[in-house]
Amino acid sequence: MTIEKTDAEWRDQLSDIEYRVTREAATERPFTGRYWDHWARGIYHCVCCGTPLFESSTKFDAGCGWPSYFAPINGEVIAEKTDHSHGMVRIEVQCKQCGAHLGHVFEDGPAPTGLRYCINSAALKFGD
């Protein structure tokens, strides 16, 4: 992790939902985030540090209510760790640059990877 800020700095920078999702690993409600049904062409960046994370060309409708992608923009931007919360074992996805919680990755996605990166809209900022 190369970008580190104090809790107060993150709170000043982020909205309440962005802070809860990215810094406290909360999950936004399905079908409520700004990007779950967003199909413009461009890049989805980390809301905390601006790192490019996902390209719109890898986004697909998984029917789950969260933005879903079959691959990150490259292998250097995402960190994965085992998450034992809520009585489940899942793989948490974090921004490698700032440690922001993004969501989880599952092995039920489409070709070519077979992966579904299920990401909270509050963890993302869309742009070019």
UniProtKB/Swiss-Prot annotation:
Q: Where is the active site?
A: C118
Which residues are noted in the entry as Zn(2+)-binding? C46, C49, C95, C98
Name of this chain's protein: Peptide methionine sulfoxide reductase MsrB
PROSITE patterns from the xrefs? MSRB
Q: Which reaction does it catalyse?
A: L-methionyl-[protein] + [thioredoxin]-disulfide + H2O = L-methionyl-(R)-S-oxide-[protein] + [thioredoxin]-dithiol
Q: Which Pfam families match?
A: SelR
The record lists the lineage as: Bacteria, Pseudomonadati, Pseudomonadota, Betaproteobacteria, Burkholderiales
Q: Where is the MsrB domain?
A: 7-128
Q: Which UniProt keywords apply?
A: Metal-binding, Oxidoreductase, Zinc
**Keyword tRNA-binding (UniProt):** no
Q: What's noted on cofactor binding? A: Binds 1 zinc ion per subunit. The zinc ion is important for the structural integrity of the protein.
Q: Which PANTHER family match?
A: METHIONINE SULFOXIDE REDUCTASE, METHIONINE-R-SULFOXIDE REDUCTASE B1
| One of the record's GO cellular component terms | cytoplasm
Q: Which gene encodes it?
A: msrB
The yes or no answer to whether the keyword Transmembrane helix is present is no
Q: Which organism is it from?
A: Ralstonia nicotianae (strain ATCC BAA-1114 / GMI1000)
